[in-house]
Amino acid sequence: MSDSTFSAKNLACVRGGRVVFAGLGFSLSAGGALVLLGPNGSGKSSLLRVLAGLLKPAHGLLAWNGEALAEDPEAHAARTHYLGHHDAVKPVLSVAENLRFWAHLHDPHAERAGRAVDAALSRFGLARLATIPGKMLSAGQKRRTNLARLLAAPSPLWLLDEPTTALDKASIKVLEDVLAEHRAAGGMVVLSTHADINMPGAQELHLDQFAVAEELP
């Protein structure tokens, strides 16, 4: 992965007429990580959607290598992997089929995508569940399937909303190792969490510090 930078300056978000946060900023370079902290309703999920390009900020600038994301939203979508707090596991597809769907969207080369899927299944302990349909999975198994998409369809920037939800300690350790390897390869991670997760050197952003009481002008 290239030596890139991802930055936000003076970001503000408005949802339903309410200013969720304002004046927010950060800067990440290759290998960097940012943990979003704050109570429910402080805007962690909204910020992740803004960073993914799924929600337009009310104010402020998002930039990749100094270039505004608004200048090339398709390029930003291609380098970003966003996982929301709801698991996007298709119930009628098997675990392997779910991952193949995402892998082929990322890489149309069937053999290469297949190898990525096999590696993702193995890494997240899903190989024995590969043929099981999504509707039969437990909450933890669905979460691991969702997280396995990160390896099946790799991208430089990972945006993760509460990735440890429904995971046991062993699965959290696997996730921590995967995050560390991604960062060591030059990738970036932004995640929200209510749980402890080991990401050495990660920055912290407390969203309640950017709450405002009045409407933006």
Curated annotation (Swiss-Prot):
Does Ligase show up as a keyword for this record?
no
Q: Which reaction does it catalyse?
A: heme b(in) + ATP + H2O = heme b(out) + ADP + phosphate + H(+)
Membrane topology summary: Peripheral membrane protein
Say which species the protein is native to.
Paramagnetospirillum magneticum (strain ATCC 700264 / AMB-1)
Q: Biological process GO terms, please?
A: cytochrome complex assembly
Q: Which residues bind ATP?
A: 38-45
Q: Where in the cell is it found?
A: Cell inner membrane
The UniProt entry, under InterPro entries, shows: AAA+_ATPase, ABC_transporter-like_ATP-bd, ABC_transptr_haem_export_CcmA, P-loop_NTPase
Predominant location of this chain?
Answer: membrane
Q: Which Gene3D superfamilies match?
A: P-loop containing nucleotide triphosphate hydrolases
| Name of protein | Cytochrome c biogenesis ATP-binding export protein CcmA
Catalytic activity, EC: 7.6.2.5
Q: One Pfam family, please name it.
A: ABC_tran
Q: Does the keyword Transmembrane apply?
A: no
Task: Output the Gene Ontology terms for molecular function.
Answer: ABC-type heme transporter activity; ATP binding; ATP hydrolysis activity
The cross-references to NCBIfam families, in alphabetical order and at most eight, read: ccmA (TIGR01189), PRK13538.1 (NF010061)
The record's subunit annotation is: The complex is composed of two ATP-binding proteins (CcmA) and two transmembrane proteins (CcmB).
TM stretches of this protein: none
Role played? Part of the ABC transporter complex CcmAB involved in the biogenesis of c-type cytochromes; once thought to export heme, this seems not to be the case, but its exact role is uncertain. Responsible for energy coupling to the transport system.
Where is the organism placed in the taxonomic lineage, from the top?
Bacteria, Pseudomonadati, Pseudomonadota, Alphaproteobacteria, Rhodospirillales
